[in-house]
From Swiss-Prot:
Keywords carried by this UniProt record: Membrane, Transmembrane, Transmembrane helix
Protein name: Uncharacterized protein PAE0586/PAE2015
Membrane topology: Single-pass membrane protein
Chain ranges passing through the membrane: 7-27
One GO CC term on file: membrane
Annotated compartments: Membrane
Superkingdom: Archaea
C-alpha cells in the first residue's frame, strides 16, 4: 500500500511540475510578444518621426 501511495504522490508532483512549467512558458511567451510588439511600434514611430523631419528639413 505504501508503494502505491508514494507512486501516486510522485505522479501528482510530476503533473504539478509540468503544469507549472507550462504556465511559466505561456507567461514568458506572452511577455516576449508584448515587448516585441512594443519594440516594433517604437520602430514604426521612429521611422515616421524621421520621415517628418526630412520633409520639413530638420535633418
Amino acid at each position: 500500500m505504501l508503494v502505491e501511495e508514494v507512486l501516486l504522490l510522485l505522479v501528482a508532483i510530476a503533473l504539478i511540475s509540468a503544469f507549472a512549467l507550462t504556465v511559466t512558458g505561456v507567461v514568458q511567451n506572452a511577455v516576449s510578444q508584448i515587448l516585441g510588439f512594443r519594440n516594433a511600434t517604437n520602430n514604426v514611430i521612429n521611422g515616421l518621426v524621421d520621415a517628418v523631419k526630412q520633409l520639413i528639413g530638420l535633418s
